[in-house]
Amino acid sequence: MPYAVLGATGNCGTALIQNLLQSSTSKVHAYCRDRRKLLYLLPHLADNKQVDIFDGSIHDLPLITECVRNCHAVFLVISTNDNVPQCRMALDTATAVIQALRILHGEGASMPKLVLLSSATLDDQLSQNTAPWVRWILLKSASQVYQDLSQAEAFLRQQQDWISTIFIKPGGLSVDVQRGHRLSLTEEKSPLSYLDLAAAMIEAADDPDGRYDLRNVGVAYTDGPARFPRGAPMCIFMGLVRHFLPFLHPYLPATGPNQGFLC
């Protein structure tokens, strides 16, 4: 069963590939900008017949079309930990995928399910256990990223008459081992490991009843939290600087992705 992972070199992308390859029947279409980087992160992919790598620009429509062709689900996980001014990663990815799917739809192909990685911070229900002042800080520290995600979500919801999307919204994320997860429509529990997040995204995509289609879906850990992402404080601080003083962005350090971050 083919799955496309757009953003294969990120923490979530590599975790998705690792989880998917646990099944001998899974086929992975891994999209990235840099094949060498992906093979550096996951060297065993070089001779893995379950994986096809598609490297190039997200604006390369023929490339993206072939990447998502015949897929059961497409995971949209291209993002950044940095509060980049005028960030468009999520919206550009969603737009490229929809353009590709329109071509395939015109050919009579069956449509995949889309799974967008978003954030619990954007959802009042899923953020119910987050202190208001903490949520305010998070919203400001990733304001550009969240605006991009909100626009991508709105765009994908406009396609709901012909494409189903699941909006996965975790809380804090950390590079850690897999501990177990639980999908929820009412809460998130974090910090959560990327491996648990990836397993949750696959479970939601594979749900035979479509219970998570067009829903905001939280993820909770089930066997204890992941370790606290040590890069989170610096990520948040630099995000606040970029929010209030965006002209400083070119001079500020990157804060990820390997350190983990808070969504």
Curated annotation (Swiss-Prot):
Q: Which purpose does this protein serve, as stated in its record?
A: Oxidoreductase; part of the gene cluster that mediates the biosynthesis of trypacidin, a mycotoxin with antiprotozoal activity and that plays a role in the infection process. The pathway begins with the synthesis of atrochrysone thioester by the polyketide synthase (PKS) tpcC. The atrochrysone carboxyl ACP thioesterase tpcB then breaks the thioester bond and releases the atrochrysone carboxylic acid from tpcC. The decarboxylase tpcK converts atrochrysone carboxylic acid to atrochrysone which is further reduced into emodin anthrone.
Question: Which family is this sequence assigned to?
Answer: Belongs to the avfA family.
- The gene that this protein is the product of is tpcG
Q: Which SUPFAM superfamilies match?
A: NAD(P)-binding Rossmann-fold domains
What is this protein's tissue specificity according to the annotation? Specifically expressed in conidia.
GO molecular function (one): monooxygenase activity
**Under which EC number(s) is this enzyme classified?**
1.-.-.-
Q: Which UniProt keywords apply?
A: Monooxygenase, Oxidoreductase
Pathway in which this enzyme or protein is active? Secondary metabolite biosynthesis
Q: Any idea what this protein is called?
A: Oxidoreductase tpcG
Q: Which GO terms describe its biological process?
A: secondary metabolite biosynthetic process
Per the UniProt record, the source organism is: Aspergillus fumigatus (strain ATCC MYA-4609 / CBS 101355 / FGSC A1100 / Af293) (Neosartorya fumigata)
